[in-house]
């Protein structure tokens, strides 16, 4: 296995080193080929490394900085003034080829702004997109993009998102010709605004993307398609609504299983199965949103992620780096554009 180096914004998120450092140690235990550069306040980081095994410490490097991008920083302000922040330095490690990927649980807007400026977009990509997984009844992940990086998108941008999402699914899940759909207000060809209509026409003119047509909101979790494309306004609302519904269902299930002696007895008997179902509904199980379309790999973790959830984001970054995702997207876009122009 080829050695990989990840850069972690150790100070990002609600919990900082309390979560990021233990998660990094667990990642090193899982992947013997992995090296991790922790960027942040060395004094705070060292607290969580005191009990670490020597063989793990040998694969950790610390780059000290006491500057942090706060959750309240506006993206433009962070880009202009937080030039020595843990987030920016972690991204610069990817830009300078010292790391193959970066993971941060910090300010999403600042992360996207810094990544776009420092890493630049791939040839043929107008805007990067934020993409993550949703659960489905088929037990396989469904990729949804964009999740908020671009509030409004033209048809060409939606087309590019479809290509990037398809390649991501192929790379991470090793799925041949994943099914791609555009999220719309109806499945009929006449439905939707001009941007969605024109994006559909572009996708219908290439055989390299397995475009299946429109999909409505009630089919998002069906598993009938692998990649769902929309603008960032719709995608972000869809994601946050999904997380809210998942929390509601978990709450209602737990409350229902504690009412009455007989129900509590049955709950104990089927506890392992209940736990498995709750795990599948837990948003942390799908933690890690990829900012794709850049010349480097950037993965965004939930700000409130715990150690296990943050480890999931690290694992996603490892997989994307192993598959060389940016190169795959670049090659596929070039091939499709050449095909269309001919």
Swiss-Prot record:
| Record organism | Shewanella baltica (strain OS155 / ATCC BAA-1091)
Query: NCBIfam families from the entry?
Result: plsX (TIGR00182)
Q: What is one process in the GO biological process aspect for this record?
A: fatty acid biosynthetic process
**What is the name of the protein in this document?**
Phosphate acyltransferase
Name the EC number(s): 2.3.1.274
The record describes the protein's role as: Catalyzes the reversible formation of acyl-phosphate (acyl-PO(4)) from acyl-[acyl-carrier-protein] (acyl-ACP). This enzyme utilizes acyl-ACP as fatty acyl donor, but not acyl-CoA.
**What pathway is it annotated to?**
Lipid metabolism; phospholipid metabolism
Q: How does it assemble?
A: Homodimer. Probably interacts with PlsY.
What Pfam family does this protein match (any one)? Answer: FA_synthesis
Q: Which InterPro entries would you find in this protein's record? A: FA_synthesis, Phospholipid_synth_PlsX-like
Q: Which UniProt keywords apply?
A: Cytoplasm, Lipid biosynthesis, Lipid metabolism, Phospholipid biosynthesis, Phospholipid metabolism, Transferase
Q: What is the reaction catalyzed?
A: a fatty acyl-[ACP] + phosphate = an acyl phosphate + holo-[ACP]
